[in-house]
């Protein structure tokens, strides 16, 4: 072992022998070779691969290698500054020198830095991931990205330190781009919600199932996880979104390797940007920044092809030049042909050029957000890729995009000096109508909706949820609820369409909350268009033709009924419309389409909407001694197209008036609570005439959307004989009274209302209860339009139909009020003035109750409804007393 050590020391010492021998011969060359090449020092096995790596210099006697040898320890003194007198630098001088060196390095650029780092690598080395890197570089070259070797780019740990650069300059640097790329890719892979679910894994899966190319990223999530990226994004959106798109594409291709056959690019869409700018507040400081604004789409061009990656043919040598990637700001053209060095001419290669979808829209400020006395401002926006056709005229949208400027020669001519036109390059669009869309309903929402449908009184709860701040008017609330749910449209054999929407007409005295009902429906309906008859013309309701300002072609612009397709069109002051304008909606109300033949355009537009109109009677107030047709200035074809007619009368009833006043005052107190009430924790509960708890507005909206989308009731189990007998009875009564004509349309109306009631309960088939409710609503609508003299006898005739789903207490209260009205009229005629108390014999109420098969009245006397209307029962006198 000692011999081995001695041999090791002699062999590994570079200082043995003369200087020339040390420089010209390798150490250990004079040693005898090992007998076994696999046998190393100390008898250890040495792999053969280590022979090329040199000899082992570390051993037990390695200190002897560093002993002093005077003959050999001589070095050249040239270039050494040990003996020069150099003063030590101060701290300020050192900082100044380092600053100067940093400035020099910055001017030399990052290319030199990459080249210097590249010299450290052996050119003969073969990287293990060479095929993958070649493929990645080829893909980046095909996409127009600069060829960069990630291994040669120095990583940045402190991304916030921009070293004096602007955000746009800092983000454009290669090292910064690479760091942002990795951070965003890691964010997409690892971000989870509060339940621990991977957010973007589900989003990417849903996106690929629908063959889309947009991945929506919530800005609030990005800011919470990667605040530096969230800071850079609004300042340099074009550069950041390009990096985001590349990272998102790589993440998608890892999950679905062949998805690039479906979508060449993946676009990251930014939603929930915190700051919302108004269109009129956009200024110069917003240029080239990410903004979020809102407005109404007023104009929309067709979808046009835009050059994305263009290739040119040289007409002289047929060489294909390119690809050239076009940007939004400038057009890229080839200078000369690299094959024949000619300067042209060049023509576009149509086969290899890649196009993308392009659409230009105009958004205008929402009418409710414009200050008094101001005109609404508008701004153009550009939609690219899969954003095209994501909105149409009339939609109120929230738009997130980059605020750009471009050159416009017409503006320079008009202003006399250089002015740039501004445009918004859209990144993300959200319709305000679709915020609660069926696709966005969660599983918890669906479970809650199905659980609500199993409630026995869900129908009454929905009726009570319609305009809960309006007291009474149960018939109007019932009709509007049925109209919101709607029936089922039919098209037997594809030959004749039968509408499924229910049209409602509200007519009555002023001040009876008709317009408030319309406003509430506008909030609850998923898609609603509100207009007034006085401000709406025929073309404003249907459609009109105008010359497009950009293309100078005649274009068709949609009116209110077309914009309300698949929704609700609300028309207030329906009686103020001109007769010519009113007749224009005949086709829309029945066939649900609008035929246009103007300026060489012959087409038909869809208007599949529910129409809810409100009108005032002739002379201002409704006269109960006249029929409905004599009270309203509407033609018979229009009236027959409405399924439900609701007449609202402002009658004088001291008890009802006091209850209404209490309700209004209580509503104001609830919405303006005092500090004392808040401190005491008191809650004001508005009285409810239905006696059930109403649904919250958001829940009702989701319930309606789910039922209209998922439930399609059928008529297999419908009682046809009952509907036929009811129709014949109504025809006979209408001929006798001459109020409103009963036509075959009313049979279809009853069927539609039965389907709507079944849909309200999430039933797949129409049952007897649905038919009974439809008959009851139809009868109430028909009886309310009769003269007062005919109304009472007609209620007796159809009493068994009207009693459906009515509480016995409600029926008894209605009968008791009729007896009180008769007694009041008698006392007024006898004594000349109304008394403070009215007494009705109990026997009269018992006789009336037996006619409707009610025999026990004790529960009615003890009910809250009896006491709420200020009735008391005197058992000794056998009288029912009402105090005013």
Curated annotation (Swiss-Prot):
Record-listed E.C. numbers: 3.6.4.12
Post-translational modification: May be in a phosphorylated state in the mitotic mcm complex. Phosphorylated in the interphase mcm complex. Phosphorylated by the cdc7-dbf4 and cdc7-dbf4b complexes.
Gene3D superfamilies: 2.20.28.10, mini-chromosome maintenance (MCM) complex, chain A, domain 1, Nucleic acid-binding proteins, P-loop containing nucleotide triphosphate hydrolases
Region of interest (Disordered), residue spans: 1-61, 120-151
Binding site for ADP: 515-516
GO molecular function: ATP binding; ATP hydrolysis activity; DNA binding; helicase activity; zinc ion binding
CDD domains: MCM2 (cd17753)
PROSITE patterns linked to this entry: MCM_1 (PS00847), MCM_2 (PS50051)
Function: Acts as a component of the MCM2-7 complex (MCM complex) which is the replicative helicase essential for 'once per cell cycle' DNA replication initiation and elongation in eukaryotic cells. Core component of CDC45-MCM-GINS (CMG) helicase, the molecular machine that unwinds template DNA during replication, and around which the replisome is built.
Remaining remarks: Early fractionation of eukaryotic MCM proteins yielded a variety of dimeric, trimeric and tetrameric complexes with unclear biological significance. Specifically a MCM467 subcomplex is shown to have in vitro helicase activity which is inhibited by the MCM2 subunit. The MCM2-7 hexamer is the proposed physiological active complex.
PANTHER family: DNA REPLICATION LICENSING FACTOR MCM FAMILY MEMBER, DNA REPLICATION LICENSING FACTOR MCM2
Protein's UniProt name: DNA replication licensing factor mcm2
């Amino acid at each position: 072992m000692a011999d081995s050590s001695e041999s090791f020391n002699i062999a590994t010492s570079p200082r043995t022998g003369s200087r020339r021998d040390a420089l010209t011969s390798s150490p250990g060359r004079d040693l005898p070779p090992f007998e076994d090449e696999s046998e190393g020092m100390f008898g250890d096995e040495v792999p053969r691969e280590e022979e090329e790596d040199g000899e082992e210099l570390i051993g037990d006697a390695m200190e002897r290698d560093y002993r002093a040898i005077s003959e050999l320890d001589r070095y050249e003194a040239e270039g050494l500054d040990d003996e020069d007198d150099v003063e030590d630098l101060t701290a300020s001088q050192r900082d100044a020198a380092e600053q100067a060196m940093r400035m020099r390095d910055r001017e030399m650029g990052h290319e030199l830095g990459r080249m210097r780092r590249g010299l450290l690598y052996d050119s003969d080395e073969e990287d293990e991931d060479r095929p993958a890197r070649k493929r990645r570089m080829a893909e980046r070259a095909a996409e127009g990205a600069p060829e960069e070797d990630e291994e040669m780019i120095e990583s940045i740990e402190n991304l916030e330190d921009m070293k004096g650069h602007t955000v746009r300059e800092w983000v454009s640097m290669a090292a910064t781009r690479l760091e942002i790329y990795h951070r965003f890719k890691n964010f997409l892979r690892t971000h989870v919600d509060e339940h621990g679910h991977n957010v973007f894994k589900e989003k990417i899966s849903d996106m690929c199932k629908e063959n889309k190319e947009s991945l929506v990223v919530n800005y609030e999530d990005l800011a919470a996880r990667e605040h530096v990226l969230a800071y850079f994004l609004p300042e340099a959106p074009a550069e950041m979104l390009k990096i985001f798109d590349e990272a998102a594409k790589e993440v998608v291709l890892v999950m679905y390797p062949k998805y690039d056959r479906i979508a060449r690019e993946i676009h990251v869409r930014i939603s929930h940007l915190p700051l919302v700018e108004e269109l009129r507040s956009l200024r110069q400081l917003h240029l080239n920044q990410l903004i979020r604004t809102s407005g109404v789409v007023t104009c929309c061009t067709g979808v046009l092809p835009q050059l994305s990656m263009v290739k040119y043919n040289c007409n002289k040598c047929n060489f294909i030049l390119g690809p050239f990637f076009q940007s939004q700001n400038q057009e890229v053209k080839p200078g000369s042909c690299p094959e024949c060095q000619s300067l042209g001419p060049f023509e576009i290669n149509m086969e290899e050029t890649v196009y993308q979808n392009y659409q230009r829209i105009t958004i205008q400020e929402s009418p409710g957000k414009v200050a008094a006395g101001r005109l609404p401002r508008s701004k153009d926006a550009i939609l690219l890729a899969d954003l095209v056709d994501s909105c149409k005229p009339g939609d109120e949208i929230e738009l997130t995009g980059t605020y750009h400027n471009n050159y416009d020669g017409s503006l320079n001519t008009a202003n006399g000096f250089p002015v740039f036109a501004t445009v918004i390059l859209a990144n993300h669009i959200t319709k305000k109508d679709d915020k609660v869309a069926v696709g966005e309903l969660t599983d918890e929402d669906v479970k809650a909706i199905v659980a609500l449908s199993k409630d026995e009184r869900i129908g009454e709860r929905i009726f009570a949820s319609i305009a809960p701040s309006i007291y009474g008017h149960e018939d109007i609330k019932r009709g509007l609820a049925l109209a919101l749910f709607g029936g089922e449209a039919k098209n037997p054999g594809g030959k004749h369409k039968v509408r499924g929407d229910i049209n409602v007409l509200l007519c009555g005295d002023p001040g009876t909350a008709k317009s408030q009902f319309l406003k509430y429906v506008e909030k609850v309906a998923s898609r609603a268009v509100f207009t007034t008859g006085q401000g709406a013309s025929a073309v404003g309701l249907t459609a009109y033709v105008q010359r497009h300002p950009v293309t100078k072609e005649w274009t068709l612009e949609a009116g209110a009924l077309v914009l309300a397709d698949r929704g609700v069109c609300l028309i207030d002051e329906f009686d103020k419309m001109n007769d010519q304008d009113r007749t224009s909606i005949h086709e829309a109300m029945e066939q649900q389409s609008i035929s246009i033949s103007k300026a060489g355009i012959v087409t038909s537009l869809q208007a599949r909407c529910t129409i809810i109109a409100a009108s005032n009677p002739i002379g201002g107030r409704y006269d109960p001694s006249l029929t409905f047709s004599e009270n309203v200035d509407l033609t018979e074809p229009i009236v027959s197209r409405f399924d439900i007619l609701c007449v609202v009368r402002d009658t004088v009833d001291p008890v009802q008036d006091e209850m209404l006043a209490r309700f209004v005052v209580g509503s104001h107190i609830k919405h303006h609570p005092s500090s004392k009430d808040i401190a005491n924790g008191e809650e004001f509960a508005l009285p409810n005439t239905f006696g059930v708890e109403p649904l919250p507005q958001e829940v009702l909206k989701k319930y309606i959307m789910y039922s209209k989308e998922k439930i399609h009731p059928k008529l297999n189990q419908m009682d046809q004989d009952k509907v036929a007998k009811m129709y014949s009875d109504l025809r006979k009564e209408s001929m006798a009274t001459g109020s409103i004509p009963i036509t075959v349309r009313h049979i279809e109306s009853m069927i539609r209302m039965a389907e709507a009631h079944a849909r309200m309960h999430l039933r797949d088939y129409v049952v007897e209860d649905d038919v009974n409710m439809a008959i009851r609503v139809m009868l109430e609508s028909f009886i309310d339009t009769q003269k007062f003299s005919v109304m009472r006898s007609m209620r007796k005739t159809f009493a068994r139909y009207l009693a459906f789903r009515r509480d016995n207490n409600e029926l008894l209260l209605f009968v008791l009020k009729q007896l009180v009205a008769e007694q009041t009229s008698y006392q007024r005629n006898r004594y000349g003035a109304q008394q403070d108390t009215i007494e009705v014999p109990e026997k009269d109420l018992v006789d009336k109750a037996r006619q409707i098969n009610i025999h026990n009245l004790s529960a009615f006397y003890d009910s809250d409804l009896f006491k709420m209307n200020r009735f008391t029962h005197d058992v000794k006198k056998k009288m029912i007393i009402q105090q005013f």
